[in-house]
UniProtKB/Swiss-Prot annotation:
One of its GO terms (cellular component) is ribonucleoprotein complex. It comes from the Bacteria. The keyword RNA-binding applies. The gene is rplT. GO terms for biological process: ribosomal large subunit assembly; translation. InterPro entries: Ribosomal_bL20, RIBOSOMAL_L20_CS, Ribosomal_protein_bL20_C. It holds the Pfam family Ribosomal_L20. PROSITE patterns: RIBOSOMAL_L20 (PS00937). GO terms for molecular function: rRNA binding; structural constituent of ribosome. This is Large ribosomal subunit protein bL20. It comes from Chlamydia caviae (strain ATCC VR-813 / DSM 19441 / 03DC25 / GPIC) (Chlamydophila caviae). Binds directly to 23S ribosomal RNA and is necessary for the in vitro assembly process of the 50S ribosomal subunit. It is not involved in the protein synthesizing functions of that subunit. Belongs to the bacterial ribosomal protein bL20 family. The keyword NAD does not apply.
Length: 121
C-alpha cells in the first residue's frame, strides 16, 4: 500500500506562512522555518500593539482636551470633574472631536462644566 504523505496539507500550511512572510527581509521571506518563527513573532507584536493603540488614542484625546479646556479657562481635570457634576455624559473621544470641529459647542460645554463646579463650591 502507498504511504500517505500529507503533502497537500503540508503545502497549504507552508504556503499560508510564506504568504504572511511576504515583504520580510532575506531568508525570512522564502524559507519556511525562518518564515514561521518570524511570522509568529510578527503576530505577537501585532496583537500587543492592537491593544496599545486604544491607550494611545485615549492619550491623544486627553492631550487635545487639555489644550481646548485651557483655552476656555479650565484645566483638563477640572473640566472632567465639572462635566461629571453637571451630569454631562460625553466620552473623551466625542469631546475631542467637538473641540476640533465645533469649538463654539465645546466652549458651551466647558461653560456648563464651570457653572457646575461653581455650584458645588
Amino acid at each position: 500500500m502507498v504511504r500517505a504523505t500529507g503533502s497537500v496539507a503540508s503545502r497549504r500550511r507552508r504556503k499560508r506562512v510564506l504568504k504572511q512572510a511576504k515583504g520580510f527581509w532575506g531568508d525570512r521571506k522564502g524559507h519556511f522555518r525562518q518564515s514561521r518563527s518570524s511570522v509568529m513573532r510578527a503576530m505577537a507584536f501585532n496583537y500587543m500593539h492592537r491593544k496599545d493603540r486604544k491607550g494611545d488614542f485615549r492619550s491623544l484625546w486627553i492631550a487635545r482636551l487639555n489644550v481646548a479646556s485651557r483655552i476656555n479657562g479650565l484645566s483638563y481635570s477640572r473640566l472632567i470633574n465639572g462635566l461629571k457634576c453637571a451630569g454631562i455624559d460625553l466620552n473623551r473621544k466625542m469631546l475631542s472631536e467637538m473641540a476640533i470641529h465645533n469649538p463654539m459647542g465645546f466652549a458651551e460645554v466647558a461653560n456648563q462644566a464651570k457653572k457646575a463646579l461653581e455650584a458645588t463650591i
